Amino acid sequence: MFRTILGGKIHRATVTEADLNYVGSITVDQDLLDAAGICPNEKVAIVNNNNGERFETYTIAGKRGSGVICLNGAAARLVQKGDIVIIMSYIQLSEPEIAAHEPKVVLVDGNNKIRDIISYEPPHTVL
């Protein structure tokens, strides 16, 4: 049996742009994608901490070091520039694989620069 488990996430990133006229997706700084183990074109779930919206799309690699977090197409209606979002990818693992798996949690600063990468989420802690 396989279970769907958190693979990686970018925690509390700041939306830098919202482009309604683009075809779709979320553009994310390639450095952040790499750090979280998220691939270009991978399906991701997004939570907007400002308004509670939860939605899915796929990733497009943005310029390295740019800090870009741009929601494109219809998803641009669900965010505003400056909103705080969490970007999560999920993977399918077998029962034996789950015990050894450690998701990559990328913590960023207000400019979407990596400030830490952890493999766990402390309970009841604000990161």
Curated annotation (Swiss-Prot):
Full protein name: Aspartate 1-decarboxylase
Keywords: Autocatalytic cleavage, Cytoplasm, Decarboxylase, Lyase, Pantothenate biosynthesis, Pyruvate, Schiff base, Zymogen
Active site, UniProt feature: S25, Y58
InterPro entries: Asp_de-COase-like_dom_sf (IPR009010), Asp_decarbox (IPR003190)
Post-translation changes: Is synthesized initially as an inactive proenzyme, which is activated by self-cleavage at a specific serine bond to produce a beta-subunit with a hydroxyl group at its C-terminus and an alpha-subunit with a pyruvoyl group at its N-terminus.
Presence of keyword Lyase: yes
Subunit structure: Heterooctamer of four alpha and four beta subunits.
Purpose: Catalyzes the pyruvoyl-dependent decarboxylation of aspartate to produce beta-alanine.
A single BP term in Gene Ontology: pantothenate biosynthetic process
Cofactor binding, note field: Binds 1 pyruvoyl group covalently per subunit.
Disulfide partners: none
This protein's encoding gene: panD
Native organism taxonomy: Bacteria, Pseudomonadati, Pseudomonadota, Betaproteobacteria, Neisseriales
Chaperone as UniProt keyword: no
Residues recorded as bearing Pyruvic acid (Ser) in the entry: S25
GO molecular function: aspartate 1-decarboxylase activity
List of residues binding substrate: T57, G73, A74, A75
Pfam families linked to this entry: Asp_decarbox
EC number of the protein: 4.1.1.11
